[in-house]
């Protein structure tokens, strides 16, 4: 595992900046079901179909 090497880009030193980066990442993600309920429904159906026939 890489050692921690501080610096200006270190989120541990600036929690507010880390929070903002997390929000931006979530907004940019294209797989957000909140904005597409139909897609979420289809994903749920697919998951249910695959979870029952494994044995």
UniProtKB/Swiss-Prot annotation:
Region (Disordered): 1-55
Induction: Highly expressed in biofilms.
Pfam families on file: KGG
Domain of life: Bacteria
Biased composition (Basic and acidic residues): 11-23, 36-45
Disruption phenotype: Knockout of the gene increases production of pyocyanine and promotes P.aeruginosa pathogenicity in vivo. Deletion of the gene has no effect on phagocytosis, but it significantly reduces the production of cytokines in murine macrophage-like RAW264.7 cells and human macrophage-like cell line THP-1. In an acute pneumonia murine infection model, infection with the mutant inhibits cytokine secretion in the lungs but increases the infiltration of inflammatory cells compared to the wild-type strain.
Purpose: May be involved in the regulation of the production of pyocyanine, one of the major virulence factors secreted by P.aeruginosa, and other virulence factors.
Family the UniProt entry places it in: Belongs to the con-10 family.
The protein, known as: Putative virulence-regulating protein PA2146
Gene source species: Pseudomonas aeruginosa (strain ATCC 15692 / DSM 22644 / CIP 104116 / JCM 14847 / LMG 12228 / 1C / PRS 101 / PAO1)
Lineage: Bacteria, Pseudomonadati, Pseudomonadota, Gammaproteobacteria, Pseudomonadales
């Amino acid at each position: 595992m890489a050692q921690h090497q501080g610096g200006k880009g270190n989120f541990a030193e600036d929690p507010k900046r880390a929070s903002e980066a997390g929000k931006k990442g979530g907004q940019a993600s294209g797989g957000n079901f909140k904005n597409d309920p139909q897609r979420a429904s289809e994903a749920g159906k697919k998951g249910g179909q695959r979870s029952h026939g494994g044995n």
